């Protein structure tokens, strides 16, 4: 491998370091779009962490000199981060798109596989064959077939296309890595660099899917806090756990607006089962 500016794997290193910065910035937009629900925001933050952790560990590992302690440590962290990213990608998708067992059951399964996977990869890293570790990663990742099936069944094929694109990109990259093909410029642009390109592409497809759905309502019950002045000539409502706000000069009109808003917000998404209004009367204090 030919070094450049002190980077021992220059293409792979720069690709992933730039991607780490890019996904960190992109995470801000995810959180902003998800704002209003603590669960949504937590899912976006975990997902963003998994992306930044993987690409920063990988980018740093590839810039270090071969057969050094630092490179060996970061290589182990890099492989552990693959598990974290795969599991982390399931979190926002199942949080946003499903409820009940389809949400928590699948996430429990994924993390029950991921945690031992991280431990085994870390402990047996030096003795584990590459084909076995790649098989583990692909096996966990292709639980995404179940995710895609559930999305297709509930929302239609079009809604799941970016999940498929991302999974396909990851798989193509893994096959290239295993076959050590293609080699464009020996010592500079090799199969491993193409692998990184397809990892970025797969992560990008999945990020876009999550972003498209980041503001989806996730609760089956929506509570609105309704405030009004003493003579009931002004009403203002905001939703608990979501960024929904309404104003009106009558309660009946407020309810009509609320019905339209809920209908629009939940159209084609998880159905809402109940809307609850909690009233709060505003009172002026004179000094």
Predicted regions: what they are:
Residues 234-236:
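Short aromatic-glycine-enriched beta-strand elements
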Residues 3, 180, 250, 254-257:
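Terminal low-complexity, poorly structured segments
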Residues 5-6, 230-232:
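Generic alpha-helix initiation/capping and coil-helix boundary signal
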Residues 238-242:
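Short glycine-enriched loop/turn motifs at secondary-structure junctions
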Residues 219-230, 245, 252, 256-287:
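Short, charged, surface-exposed hinge/linker loops at domain edges
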